[in-house]
């Protein structure tokens, strides 16, 4: 019998979900767009400030983990728990929460990664440092190339230790 994800140790999870990098895939943009539309189908429009494709899959020139990162910004007056509950009801798993930030994932199964995997970063409006990082890499190809080299150099060394890799 396969253990449920929530019953696995961190080490077991790292074995099941190793770090894996791929050359940029054009389909990642499509995955983001399809998931964005799906999110818009169940989240109240007035509770969305912005949805953004972030992370390495949003930078077309670099290798990345085949996991699409999405940032969802909500108005500061919104009860984050309401959005959390809607995400949980629609297939997302809450991974962590702290001081006005929640992280979710989708596509992690007891037998490994699903075909499409997403990390969703729920934030209050204006808490979006990842957008600056994404934009900087997109606007500075030499820096993006250095970042890619760093990622590739750490990949195999920390393949089964996500904390050390990041």
Task: Go through the PLM ranges and name each one.
Residues 39-78:
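Active-site nucleotide-donor binding segment shared across nucleotidyl transfer reactions
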Residues 1-52:
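Helical scaffold of the NTase/Pol beta-like nucleotidyltransferase catalytic core
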Residues 124-166:
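Catalytic cores of NTP-dependent nucleotidyl/adenyl transfer enzymes across multiple folds
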Residues 46, 91-92:
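Short glycine-aromatic motifs
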Residues 17-27, 71-73, 133-137:
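Short histidine-centered catalytic/ligand-binding loop motif
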Residues 82-90:
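Short amphipathic alpha-helices in soluble, non-transmembrane regions
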Residues 92-125:
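Conserved catalytic core of two-metal-ion nucleotidyltransferases
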């Amino acid at each position: 019998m396969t253990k449920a994800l929530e019953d696995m140790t961190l080490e077991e999870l790292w074995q099941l979900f190793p770090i894996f990098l791929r050359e940029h895939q054009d389909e990642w943009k499509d995955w983001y767009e399809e998931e964005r539309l799906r999110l818009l189908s169940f989240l109240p429009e007035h509770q969305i400030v912005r949805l953004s494709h972030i992370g390495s899959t949003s930078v077309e020139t670099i290798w990345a983990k085949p996991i699409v990162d999405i940032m969802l910004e909500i108005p500061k007056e919104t009860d984050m728990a309401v959005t959390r509950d809607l995400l949980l009801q629609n297939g997302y798993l809450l991974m962590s929460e702290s001081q006005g930030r929640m992280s979710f994932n989708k596509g992690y199964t007891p037998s490994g990664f699903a075909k499409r995997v997403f990390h969703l970063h729920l934030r209050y409006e204006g808490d979006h440092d990842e957008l600056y990082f994404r934009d900087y890499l997109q606007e500075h190809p030499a820096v993006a190339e250095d970042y890619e080299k760093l990622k590739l150099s750490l990949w195999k060394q920390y393949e089964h230790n996500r904390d050390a890799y990041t």
